[in-house]
Regions:
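Bacterial Sec-dependent N-terminal signal peptides
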Residues: 1-25
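Residues within well-ordered alpha-helical secondary structure of globular protein domains
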Residues: 12, 46, 69-72, 110
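Short, contiguous alpha-helical
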Residues: 30-34, 41, 49-92, 132-176
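Solvent-exposed, charged/polar functional surfaces in cytosolic regulatory/catalytic domains
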Residues: 39-42, 46, 110-118, 158
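Acidic/histidine-rich alpha-helical segments that form the ligand environment
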Residues: 96-132, 140-151
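Hydrophobic alpha-helical segments, especially transmembrane helices
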Residues: 3-5, 19, 38, 157, ...
Length: 176
């Protein structure tokens, strides 16, 4: 009987510990997204108003379009991963008529808030649920959010060149 109680206690401690670790994982993800939001804001602030229309070559996106593409994907990935309906229609952000510094900044920050606020609502169990992305890629919701993070990092990184071409100094790396 004592052995059964011991096993029951061990199982209980393990399950509680696992739950705490999983919740910790969500908290860490939120912390990373908050850092990414702040870092992206530094990029948006560093670009002069006149640089928002800058295209390194004719066939590339402008700085504003890069940032709007980043936020478009943030909404899309996060909506699929969290199950929350995106407040914007697919393609709407990138096609925004107002590509001014103030409007782009407002839209991009709102996109980060959508991701962060909806991640906070997720349970650890939901992170392990599967979701199909773009009607062909099956992955866990956690993996979808990681892909989203990778995507925003990629496009923010691309804008470093835009800042330099505009004569602006890119923000220092913000790993922590």
């Amino acid at each position: 009987m004592k052995f059964k109680n011991f096993i029951a206690i061990i199982c209980f401690v393990f399950l509680c510990g696992h739950s705490v670790l999983a919740q910790s994982s969500i908290n860490e993800m939120v912390k990373e997204w908050e850092r990414a939001k702040a870092y992206t804001k530094e990029y948006l602030d560093a670009m002069p108003d006149s640089g928002y229309a800058l295209k390194p070559t004719a066939d590339m996106r402008s700085f504003a379009e890069q940032m709007l593409h980043l936020t478009e994907a943030n909404y899309g990935f996060a909506s699929a991963a969290t199950g929350e309906k995106s407040p914007i229609v697919r393609g709407e952000a990138e096609k925004a008529a107002d590509k001014s510094k103030s409007n782009v900044t407002k839209m991009v920050m709102a996109g980060y808030d959508f991701v962060i606020n909806n991640m906070r609502k997720m349970s650890p169990t939901q992170l392990n649920e599967n979701v199909e992305m773009f009607d062909r890629f099956e992955m866990t919701k956690s993996a979808a959010l990681a892909k989203c993070f990778e995507h925003q990092t990629h496009h923010r990184g691309q804008t470093t060149v835009y800042l330099r071409l505009a004569g602006a100094k890119p923000p220092q790396e913000k790993l922590f």
